[in-house]
Amino acid sequence: MAIILNEMLKKSFITALLLLIFSVLRAQDGTSAFQFLKLPFSAHASALGGENISIIEDDLTMAVQNPALLSCVADKTLNLNYMLYMDGVNVGGAAFARTAGERSTWAITAQYVDYGELKETTEENIETGTFSAKDISISGIYTYDLSDYWSGGVRTNFIYSHYDKYSSFAIGVDLGLNYYHQESDFSASLVARNLGGQLKAFEERHEKLPVDVQLGFSKRLSHAPFRLSLTLHDLTHWSASTTAANNFGKKLLNHIALGIDFLPTNNFYLAAGYNFRRGEDMKINGSSHWAGFTCGTGIQLKRLKLGM
């Protein structure tokens, strides 16, 4: 009886997620607020081209990328992270996870972005003073193992932004699905991020959240210490780019992030990646695409895990 119920639950979750994603793909257009939600919470994901939803490891930050990956996280895991994103912009966060029975895991997370003191100017570029700006998000994550191969997760995110005298509050939901075949070490994930909307707008006009549908794959090679990853991201905005991409091939590349891990042991990794969208958008005056490259490393020492 339990097997039948689990199979029905798995099929219902997958069907509901696919229907929701298809409806989102048809409805999305225009700009959105809360762009800080696109920042990677995970140092490992940042190193793999800035986008990854499919690597399987005991890393709580990956559950923010894909809530279904929370099933890989050990009980009573605590995570603290900090990143100097740009000059004067500080990004930090914390997360804690607990298992709940054999198939369920829950977690709470918090993230902030502090932009420091910004100059306030008139339309004539005359400086009139300074103001502060910050973004904050607090979320809860729940994941359930639908079977030995499938897991599904949901993340509810409470979002607050304050810029000078303007503020806004929103609620977003992330839905994630992961398939993992342990014998072949192959993982595939589907995620719909930032579904929801503003409850309080900055001014009179309500803005959308930066909805992002992603599809990702990771595969560890059988006879070599490497894991390859491919992530298709921002599928809700097929033509989105600051540069013109008129053919299908260029548009497709602008939605691809590639990553590779070197895994000599279970406690250490070297990671590198390339984000085609970032490389295309950040090149200046015909310069190279090196801006799309990323890299990082991580090490686990007993109960402490470090990533950068």
What does each model-found stretch correspond to?
Residues 28-308:
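Subset of outer-membrane beta-barrel
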Residues 7, 26-28:
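Extreme N-terminus of proteins, especially the signal/transit-peptide cleavage junction
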Residues 10-18:
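Sec-dependent signal peptide recognition
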Residues 1-5, 23, 60, 188:
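Generic secretory/membrane-interface signal
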Residues 1-11, 148:
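Positively charged n-region of N-terminal signal peptides that target proteins for export
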